Amino acid sequence: MQTAYWLMVMMMVWITAPLYEGGKPNDVIRGLVPDDLTPQFILRSLISRRRSDKDVRADQTCIWKTWCPPSLWRRHDRKGKD
């Protein structure tokens, strides 16, 4: 518990240290964010991770909490072998 407390204190000191050197809060926040992280980059990465409709197979669809087919990664032939 003490380690977590001191880690939190040190992180706060590390983040706020530039303020004592005459920096503005905005500069401190900009210093924590990578330069290539822009809204366009975030949007592009979210779109590229989204599965397209053609990737969704019919056997993976669930009928509203009434029936879902078994997942393909489950191995039913291993029952009782553990």
Curated annotation (Swiss-Prot):
It comes from the Eukaryota. GO terms for cellular component: extracellular region. The keyword Secreted applies. Disulfide bonds join C62-C68. Keywords: D-amino acid, Disulfide bond, G-protein coupled receptor impairing toxin, Hydroxylation, Secreted, Signal, Toxin. The keyword Cell cycle does not apply. Residues 1-22 form the signal peptide. It is found in: Secreted. GO terms for molecular function: toxin activity. Its main location: secreted. The modification D-tryptophan is found at W64. Expressed by the venom duct. The modification 4-hydroxyproline is found at P69, P70. Residues 23-57, 72-82 form a propeptide. This peptide is an evolutionarily optimized stable analog of somatostatin. In addition, it adopts nearly identical conformations as in the somatostatin drug analog Octreotide. As this drug, it contains a D-Trp at the same position, whose synthesis is a common strategy used for enhancing the metabolic stability of compounds in drug design. Consomatins evolved by gene duplication of a 'Somatostatin and related peptides (SSRP)' gene expressed in the snail neuroendocrine system. Moderately activates human somatostatin receptors (SSTR) with a preferential activation of SSTR1 and SSTR4. In vivo, does not cause behavioral changes in mice within a few minutes of intracranial injection, but causes a progressive loss of movement thereafter. Four to five hours after injection, mice recover, even with the highest dose tested. Shows antinociception and antihyperalgesia activities in two mouse models of acute pain, most probably by acting outside the central nervous system. The cysteine framework is C-C. Belongs to the conotoxin C superfamily. Consomatin family. This is Consomatin Ro2. It comes from Conus rolani (Cone snail).
